[in-house]
């Protein structure tokens, strides 16, 4: 092999090695930041009731479910909160220290992200409250009632006066 080919081959191999190392580092970083989503039943029993798919202790996960009524315990000296989450099966305890979302309450759906410290205990770093897509804050709803009712415009929850009058008119003409 002549020296020119040898130098080209070494440059190509060096570039391929660099790309391989960069790809490996990117994949390693992504693997560290992946938070798999589980329901409380899947945390306890594994996905599809297969025990080898259970999350391991120390793994970062996201868990979604309903806050079990009567399980919210707040520490009066700090922002620490402890509550249980469940779906249709067993419960998982969530420990969180921080300010909870305004929509957080018992019976409400939430998603908690954190590290599994015991088979059924999650140390959460983030808690998100779910709400339906038709949610309107009470202050905004009161404002909408004040503004839209006199105009006969629908307030997203009840039909407007104009809609009712049209319906009565159509029913009367049939």
From Swiss-Prot:
Query: Residues on the Periplasmic side?
Result: 30-174
Spell out which residues lie on the membrane's Cytoplasmic side: 1-8
**Role:** Heme chaperone required for the biogenesis of c-type cytochromes. Transiently binds heme delivered by CcmC and transfers the heme to apo-cytochromes in a process facilitated by CcmF and CcmH.
Name of the protein in its database record:
Cytochrome c-type biogenesis protein CcmE
> A Gene Ontology CC term for this entry?
plasma membrane
The UniProt entry lists membrane topology as: Single-pass type II membrane protein
| UniProtKB keywords | Cell inner membrane, Cell membrane, Cytochrome c-type biogenesis, Heme, Iron, Membrane, Metal-binding, Signal-anchor, Transmembrane, Transmembrane helix
Family to which the UniProt record says this protein belongs? Belongs to the CcmE/CycJ family.
Tell me the Gene Ontology biological-process terms attached to this UniProt entry: cytochrome complex assembly
């Amino acid at each position: 092999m002549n020296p020119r080919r040898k130098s080209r081959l070494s440059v190509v191999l060096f570039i391929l090695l660099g790309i391989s190392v960069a790809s490996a580092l990117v994949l390693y970083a992504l693997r560290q930041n992946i938070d798999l989503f589980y329901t409380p039943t899947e945390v306890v029993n594994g996905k599809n009731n297969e025990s080898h798919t259970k999350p391991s202790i120390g793994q970062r996960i996201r868990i979604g479910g309903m806050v079990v009524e009567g399980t919210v315990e707040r520490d009066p000296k700090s922002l620490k909160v402890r509550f249980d989450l469940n779906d249709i099966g067993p419960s998982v305890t969530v420990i969180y220290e921080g300010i909870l979302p305004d929509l957080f309450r018992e019976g409400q759906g939430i998603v908690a992200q954190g590290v599994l410290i015991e088979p059924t205990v999650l140390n959460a770093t983030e808690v998100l409250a779910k709400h339906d897509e038709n949610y309107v804050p009470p202050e905004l709803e009161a404002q909408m009632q004040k503004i839209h009712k006199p105009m006969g415009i629908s307030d997203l929850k009840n039909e407007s006066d104009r809609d009712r009058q049209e319906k009565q008119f159509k029913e009367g003409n049939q």
